[in-house]
């Protein structure tokens, strides 16, 4: 059985936080690992981010990643206060588990599959380095969280 995304491989569990620097320290201490660097979400000119189908040039965040197993990450996200799937979650629910992310090929087909399953597209854009694209879907009704797809482009 292929499922909606054609994969059951989990790549990431994402958490929304108010203070990424403090949250990184706590997660690192809990996991017994080094505190990772903080990354910016990237420039709109590169990412082309949309939110609810509209351009979202001001939506950005700070991120940190913990590689906890081969191919599996914990992602911490601190939204910048502008309208986004991240800020919406923080405003509605506070800090907590936000999404499960899955590696995919052909994001466009996955958008169609997810929307047919009743999970509307919330946010979409390119990685900050333009090396791939992501999409967030509202799966709160079905799965009690958001779903993110991650498509990494082959290196040229």
Residue ranges and their predicted role:
Residues 2, 9-11, 33:
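The feature marks the first
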Residues 86:
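Zn2+-dependent peptidoglycan hydrolase active-site motif and core
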Residues 71-79:
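Ordered, amphipathic secondary-structure segments that act as subunit-interaction surfaces
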Residues 5, 16-70, 109-135, 141, ...:
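Core segments of cupin and vicinal oxygen chelate
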Residues 3-4, 91:
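Short consensus segments that form the blades of beta-propeller domains
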């Amino acid at each position: 059985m292929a499922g909606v995304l054609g994969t059951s491989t989990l790549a990431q569990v994402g958490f929304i936080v108010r203070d990424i620097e403090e949250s990184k320290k706590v997660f690192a201490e809990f996991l017994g690992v080094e505190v990772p660097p903080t990354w910016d979400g990237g420039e709109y000119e590169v990412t082309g981010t949309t939110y609810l189908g509209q351009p979202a040039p001001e939506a950005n965040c700070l991120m940190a990643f913990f590689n906890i197993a081969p191919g599996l990450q914990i992602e911490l996200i601190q939204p910048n206060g502008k309208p986004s799937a991240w800020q919406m979650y923080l405003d509605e629910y506070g800090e907590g588990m936000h999404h499960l992310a899955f590696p995919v090929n052909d994001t466009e087909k996955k958008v169609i599959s997810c929307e047919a399953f009743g999970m509307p597209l919330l946010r979409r854009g390119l990685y900050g380095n333009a090396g791939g694209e992501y999409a967030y879907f509202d799966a709160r009704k079905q799965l009690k969280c958001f779903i993110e797809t991650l498509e990494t482009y082959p290196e040229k």
